[in-house]
Amino acid sequence: MGGWSKARIQLCGRFVADIDGSRVEDTLPGRRGRVMFAYLVLNRARPVPRDTLLMAGWGEDAPAETRNALSVLLSKLRHGLGAEHLRGRTEIELLLPPTTFVDAEAALEGAHRAESSIAEGHWAQAWGPAGIAYHVATRPFLTGLEAPWID
């Protein structure tokens, strides 16, 4: 696959992962694969320890066999995405382009920019960013997927 140049990921509403113009969400291994991919997307600024991924995917009371399930899941993610994009064994890092667009992050940024503009009395400047936040926030987060960290 090589290095990716652009990615657009939609976590609110219908789950979409468009990387370099190709939809890759169907290459992810089932619901659990989508949950893990989404978690890694939102935490891509740093490597994520395997124990943290276990908690994210299965919760505090995860049975011992989930360690093997996590290894299998990560192997399938590497196969679908390309091993060069999912780095590490004890700490896992998803490598996405710096310009990656994630709708949930755009909503948070829009809300922050709107609040800052309002605080400075620039009401008109708040309109666009507030609209982005509103339109993303009206869609459910990770529709149809379940994990301890999804609320």
Residue ranges of model-derived segments:
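Intrinsically disordered, charged and Pro/Gly-enriched terminal/linker segments
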Residues: 1-3, 25-31, 39-45, 58-68, ...
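A short, compositionally biased
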Residues: 9-15, 80-81
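A structural micro-motif at secondary-structure boundaries
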Residues: 12-34
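Residue-level signal for inorganic ion chemistry
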Residues: 53, 77, 133
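Short acidic, hydrophobic short linear motifs in intrinsically disordered regions
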Residues: 47-56
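C-terminal flanking helix
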Residues: 71-74, 78-82
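Long, low-complexity, charged/polar intrinsically disordered regions in eukaryotic proteins
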Residues: 2-10
